[in-house]
């Protein structure tokens, strides 16, 4: 049980609901990584598949804001992708532009995702957690998350937040059950 679960006692897992696999695209943002040495991307792929979800696509892009935003938009337009998780480019250096690319695409941002990620990171990395700009949001009915480029950060975000919220059986609420409602604003016009 995680530290967050110990403190937030109202979480439940329903045996009455069936597991629903989610289609997830993984994007590694790096000027140097290739698939063969992409440990963070592999960490995510292994955890996604291990949980019973589907890796819909996997790519590596350089730290170029427009390229990242274009790829995010392409996945948001692809009906075979429900969720996008990127790793890398969330720090403070001049080349770290993943967060800006995500925010170029978001229709709504999930502020609590950043907060929860920082809470999870702090006991492990201490004050270094202040340098993370992990974020999450929604665009075109697709969830998007930007994680730091370390395998540990990917593991923590998946194990503590994403695996729980992407499991339809989790209560009192989860991301999967509100998929059909993400684009309600478009139907009202």
Region spans (language model):
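Non-catalytic beta/alpha edge segments that cap or flank active sites
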Residues: 1-189
């Amino acid at each position: 049980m995680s530290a967050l679960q110990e403190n937030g006692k109202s979480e439940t897992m329903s045996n009455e609901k069936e597991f629903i696999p989610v289609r997830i695209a993984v994007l590694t943002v790096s000027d140097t990584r290739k698939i063969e040495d992409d440990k963070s991307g592999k960490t995510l792929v292994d955890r996604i598949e291990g949980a019973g979800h589907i890796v819909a696509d996997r790519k590596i892009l350089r730290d170029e804001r427009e390229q990242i935003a274009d790829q995010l938009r392409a996945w948001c337009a692809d009906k075979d992708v429900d969720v996008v998780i990127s790793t890398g480019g969330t720090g403070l250096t001049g080349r770290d532009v993943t967060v800006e690319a995500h925010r170029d695409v978001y229709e709504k941002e999930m502020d609590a995702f950043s907060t929860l990620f920082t809470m999870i990171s702090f006991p492990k990395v201490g004050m270094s957690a202040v340098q993370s700009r992990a974020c999450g949001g929604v665009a075109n009915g697709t969830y998007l998350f930007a994680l730091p480029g370390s395998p540990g950060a990917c593991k923590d975000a998946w194990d503590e937040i994403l695996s729980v919220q992407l499991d339809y059986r989790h209560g009192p609420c989860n991301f999967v059950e509100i998929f059909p409602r993400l684009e309600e604003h478009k139907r009202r016009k």
